[in-house]
């Protein structure tokens, strides 16, 4: 135990618990609630000042960095599984979902204002997942039109059904095709890349091929302790892009607003 920090030990426990609960939940639905609490605990740690300070102080510790990578992979997998489970409840209580979406608008207001997203926007959302709350908020509360992309067909099925239950079919479409193969990409005013998208450079390259000259990219990412729940973006991945608005910081992730360099 000597030399192990409290944060390191806490993260070790969380990784083990999240991995086990993700497996158990597939056999016993009651485990999903416990899994949700563990993910909430991880989210809480990321937002705590003391955890951030300890992460910064130990940022050169190879054991902590390796653990962070393992924990992120476990957390991302768990969240994807949990979202699919939660979708089943959402489909039975569409009214509750509507009220929840209304309350979320302020949480993404900074991104909307910085990127200029309004009712005339056409947003391509890459990595939308089974429960695409940001996309649903944009369609329901802002009036934007969206195309949600995900490589997980099961997740798309859930998301499509939730959009139908919310009466948003006219404003939301869904696809598993790459951005470069979608006609929507050429007319999109904005591209939103989820923080859980790992291959950000590949997605940026595809978007660059087809995007309008005046379109903007909202790139959600996590660095430092926020990388425990989100994939980072490296400076080299931003070659050919320029930041066109101040970085938007959220408790769990940050957002860069990008446009083509030299346009």
UniProtKB/Swiss-Prot annotation:
Interacts with CntM. It comes from the Bacteria. This is L-histidine 2-aminobutanoyltransferase. Belongs to the methyltransferase superfamily. CntL family. Disruption phenotype: Cells lacking this gene are unable to synthesize pseudopaline and are impaired in their ability to import nickel in a minimal media, supplemented or not with nickel. Under more stringent conditions where a chelator such as EDTA is added to a minimal succinate (MS) medium, a condition that presumably mimics the chelating environment prevailing within a host or in airway mucus secretion (AMS), the deletion mutant strain is unable to import zinc, therefore reconciling the regulation of this operon by zinc with its function as a zinc importer operating in metal scarce conditions. One of its GO terms (molecular function) is nicotianamine synthase activity. Induction: Is part of the operon cntOLMI that is negatively regulated by zinc level through the Zur repressor, which leads to transcriptional activation of this operon under zinc depletion. One of its GO terms (biological process) is nicotianamine biosynthetic process. Catalyzes the nucleophilic attack of one alpha-aminobutanoate moiety from SAM onto L-histidine to produce the intermediate (2S)-2-amino-4-{[(1S)-1-carboxy-2-(1H-imidazol-4-yl)ethyl]amino}butanoate. Functions in the biosynthesis of the metallophore pseudopaline, which is involved in the acquisition of nickel and zinc, and thus enables bacterial growth inside the host, where metal access is limited. Therefore, this enzyme probably contributes to Pseudomonas virulence. Cannot use D-histidine in place of L-histidine as substrate. InterPro entries: Nicotian_synth, SAM-dependent_MTases_sf. Keywords: S-adenosyl-L-methionine, Transferase. Pfam families: NAS (PF03059). It is an enzyme of class 2 (transferase). PANTHER family: NICOTIANAMINE SYNTHASE 3 (PTHR32266:SF12). Its EC number is 2.5.1.-. It catalyses: L-histidine + S-adenosyl-L-methionine = (2S)-2-amino-4-{[(1S)-1-carboxy-2-(1H-imidazol-4-yl)ethyl]amino}butanoate + S-methyl-5'-thioadenosine + H(+).
């Amino acid at each position: 135990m000597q030399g192990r920090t409290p944060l390191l030990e806490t993260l070790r426990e969380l990784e083990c618990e999240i991995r086990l609960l993700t497996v158990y939940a597939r056999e016993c639905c009651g485990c999903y609630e416990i899994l949700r609490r563990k993910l909430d605990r991880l989210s809480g740690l990321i937002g705590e000042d003391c955890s951030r300070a300890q992460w910064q102080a130990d940022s050169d510790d190879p054991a902590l960095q390796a653990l962070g990578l393992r924990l992120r992979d476990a957390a991302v997998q768990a969240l994807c599984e949990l979202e699919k489970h939660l979708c089943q409840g959402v489909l039975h209580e569409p009214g509750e979902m509507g009220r929840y979406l209304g309350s979320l608008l302020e949480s993404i207001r900074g991104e909307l204002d910085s990127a200029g997203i309004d009712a005339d926007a056409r947003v391509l959302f890459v990595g939308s997942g089974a429960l695409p709350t940001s996309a649903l908020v944009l369609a329901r509360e802002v009036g934007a039109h969206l195309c949600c992309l995900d490589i997980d067909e099961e997740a798309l099925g859930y998301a499509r059904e939730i959009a139908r239950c919310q009466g948003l079919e006219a404003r939301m479409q869904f696809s598993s095709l790459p951005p470069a193969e979608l006609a929507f990409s050429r007319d999109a005013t904005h591209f939103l890349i989820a923080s859980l998208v790992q291959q950000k450079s590949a997605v940026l390259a595809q978007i660059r091929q087809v995007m309008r000259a005046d379109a903007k990219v909202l790139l959600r990412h996590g660095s430092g302790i926020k990388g425990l729940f989100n994939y980072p973006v490296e400076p080299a991945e931003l070659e050919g892009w320029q930041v066109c608005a101040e970085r938007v910081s959220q408790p769990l992730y940050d957002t860069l607003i990008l446009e083509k360099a030299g346009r």
